[in-house]
Amino acid sequence: MTESAKQEGDVPAGARELLLQTASDIMREGDIVDISLSELSLRSGLNSALVKYYFGNKAGLMKALLDRDMAGIVQAVDALMAKDMPPEARLRRHIGAVVDTYFKTPYLNRLLMRLVRESDDDEAHRIADSYLTPLSRAYDKLIEDGVRQGVFRNVDPQLFYFTTTGAADRFFSSRLVLKHCYDTDTLTEELRDRYREHCIDFIMSGILATR
């Protein structure tokens, strides 16, 4: 597919974004970290050749999806950290946002680990420098601000990061456990809301300083 073909309108408007969102939907609904190009084409209504046109290959599509999802997270965290608000309120809002993120993209951590593992060193460092390091620094500041103001116990920000993200990732990537132990494999908004409230209460109880 040539550039002239694109200019002539052979490529539907918004096709790149539609391919990414359809891939996201397929992985979320199937609780998987892979897609078939035939299903992607069927679900999106687009020619699978557009994957090569926009992303080079399926691996490029998966990398672009990770970039889309992780860039959105970093931007949201940066915006939250820029707000003038008390550390406790900021952390409560962040924990809720983490739960919402993994409800929307339960494949995220598995996709991240897969791409880091399968990438060469340069690409793995790019992923870390672009997304993981900024998030780590945000957690450092988030916890340090609360400790300095006497609101939070002096916990390790690195371990707190894994506690918070791990709680959300584990729950929303455990559909088989929900199915076989609790007779449900549907991630409903009601379930998300219940788990969000649970995580906020549970995690905040562990970090708030005794008053």
Give the label of every model feature segment.
Residues 2-4, 104, 133-149, 153, ...:
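C-terminal peripheral helix-coil segments that are non-catalytic and often amphipathic
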Residues 3-6, 65-93, 142-144:
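Amphipathic alpha-helical linker/stalk segments
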Residues 15-23, 40, 65-69, 73, ...:
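Generic hydrophobic, amphipathic alpha-helix propensity
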Residues 18, 26-60, 64:
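Helix-turn-helix
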Residues 22-26, 167:
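Short amphipathic alpha-helical elements of helix-turn-helix/winged-helix folds
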Residues 29-33, 84, 105, 149:
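Short coil/turn segments at alpha/beta junctions that flank glycine-rich nucleotide-binding fingerprints
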Residues 78-110, 157-164, 193-196:
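Hydrophobic alpha-helical connector segments
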Residues 100-138, 159, 185-190:
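Short secondary-structure transition hinges
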